[in-house]
From Swiss-Prot:
HAMAP family: GlmU. This is Bifunctional protein GlmU. Homotrimer. The lineage of its organism: Bacteria, Pseudomonadati, Pseudomonadota, Alphaproteobacteria, Rhodobacterales. UDP-N-acetyl-alpha-D-glucosamine binds at residues 13-16, 27, 80, 85-86, 108-110, 145, 159, 174, 231, 320, 338, 353, 364.
Length: 454
């Protein structure tokens, strides 16, 4: 019988200044896949079902902590002031983990690509060792810290500048990710010294301290692509390309059809069902779900919305937060939908704005329809019943209700509720003036000619 895994605490380091980003925004809040970098790290760790989440903040702490309230309200934060190295940063979690009986895993808020499989492998290795580090074998070891192994035992981590010629030949390098018993880790961290050129306390000293204390340390390997950290704008650009490539491949493998995958942009939390079709140049912002069999046509932009099975969106559609598109509904070209429910089988085929509204089943919204939902201070709702027909160029001045099976005449401005089955006409009577257009043109031309002579 498989043993129950020990409780786990995630410690996410998000305190660095990120000076190479050349930005007023704290580095953990720069976006990748429409989500803050730190959100990627938390999402990877969430697959391990941690009992506690501790995020170490520092530079821009107020901003980082405010974002954490939205993306991870369960997180406990601890501030590192001043920033004195990675070991010092992890030690700031001691108070939050007081009395915690379980393991602690250290992750980084600027390293978004560690997979749940790799992190789970660390937990498995932890069952046989007191300290587990995560290593990788890069194509170019360069100036990475080296993992000095003796068989299965990790003796120490040596920085490149301090390594002997023999140690520099080692190709097994340090990613910085660590897993250990939480109490043991805090005990070892308390023994760190800052006897180095930077005057900082390094997490990389923990394996050697563990060995000195009679504990065992080891390291497991992951793919180099998982270890990428982001320290500059250029690295963020490369990371975005890597993220998008991975998401496209994963969705195609899961049964999503993409006609030009390199032109489609996904977010961290994009969910798409199999047999959905995504045409070229579609952008998915945060919080979008597309159900099986739906079709998203070219040049559409979606965020904060849900598209049900069989629905068709676009081309050139914009779905904003709160848009709910029902089964087999259609939202066509140059249509914007916000905070609105488009029910099953309804059609909004072109050139319309539908906001703060409900559109009933099988209703048909004509071209140029606008729900006039904002009075300059407050938003108001428009409710359109099932099987209603809204004529082209109708202005629906909210709050207003159009009943089931009702119709509005083209060009109408609707300011009052329309009963079920009624036809509403809200436009001025047309009056034709014979010959007046010819006279008006002649008069205007004479005025223009007179001005030209002046």
């Amino acid at each position: 019988m498989q043993a129950t895994p020990r409780p786990l605490a995630l410690i996410v380091l998000a305190a660095g200044a990120g000076t190479r980003m050349n930005s007023d925004l704290p580095k953990p809040l720069h976006t990748l896949g429409s989500a803050p970098l730190v959100a990627h790290t938390i999402a990877a760790g969430a697959s391990l079902e941690p009992a506690r989440l501790v995020v170490i903040t520092g530079h821009g702490a107020d901003e980082v902590e405010a974002v954490l309230q939205d993306i991870a309200p369960e997180a406990v934060t601890a501030r590192q002031t001043p920033q004195l190295g990675t070991g010092h940063a992890v030690l700031q979690a001691a108070a939050a983990l007081e009395g915690f009986e379980g393991d602690a895993m250290v992750l980084y808020g600027d390293s978004p690509f560690f997979t749940s499989e790799t992190l789970q492998a660390m937990r498995i290795a932890r069952a046989a060792h007191d300290v587990v580090m995560l290593g990788f074998r890069p194509a170019d070891p360069g100036r990475y810290g080296r993992l000095v192994m003796d068989g299965d035992t990790l003796r120490k981590i040596v920085e490149f500048k301090d390594a002997t010629p023999e140690e520099r030949e080692i190709t097994f390098c340090n990613s910085g990710v660590l897993c250990a018993d939480a109490a043991t880790l805090m005990t070892l961290l308390a023994q760190l010294t800052n006897d180095n050129a930077a005057g900082e306390y390094y997490l990389t000293d923990v394996p050697e301290l563990a060995g000195n204390a009679g504990l065992t340390a080891t390291a497991i390997a992951c793919d180099e692509a998982e270890t990428i950290g982001i320290n500059s704008r250029a690295e963020l650009v490369r990371a975005e390309a890597q993220f998008q490539s991975q998401r496209r491949a994963a969705l195609i493998e899961a049964g999503v059809t993409m006609q030009a995958p390199d032109s489609v942009h996904f977010a961290l939390d994009t969910h798409i069902g199999r047999d959905a079709v995504i045409e070229p140049y579609v952008v998915f912002g945060a919080d979008v779900t597309v159900e099986s069999g739906a079709q998203i046509r070219a040049f559409s932009h979606l965020e904060g919305c849900h598209i049900s099975a069989g629905a068709i969106v676009g081309p050139y559609a914009r779905l904003r937060p709160g848009a709910e598109i029902g089964n087999n509904a259609k939202v066509g070209n140059f249509v914007e939908v916000k905070a609105a429910d488009i029910a099953e089988g309804a059609k909004v085929n072109h050139l319309s704005y539908i906001g703060d509204a409900t559109v009933g089943e099988r209703a048909n919204i004509g071209a140029g329809t606008v729900t006039c939902n904002y009075d300059g201070v407050m938003k108001h709702r428009t409710d359109i019943g099932a099987d209603a027909f809204i004529g082209s160029d109708t202005m629906l001045v909210a709050p207003v209700t159009v009943g089931a099976g009702a119709m509005t005449a083209s060009g109408s401005t609707i300011t009052e509720d329309v009963p079920d089955g009624a036809l509403a006409l809200g436009r001025a009577k047309q009056v034709n003036k014979p010959g007046l257009a010819t006279k008006l043109r002649a008069r205007l031309k004479a005025i223009k000619d007179a001005k030209s002579k002046d």
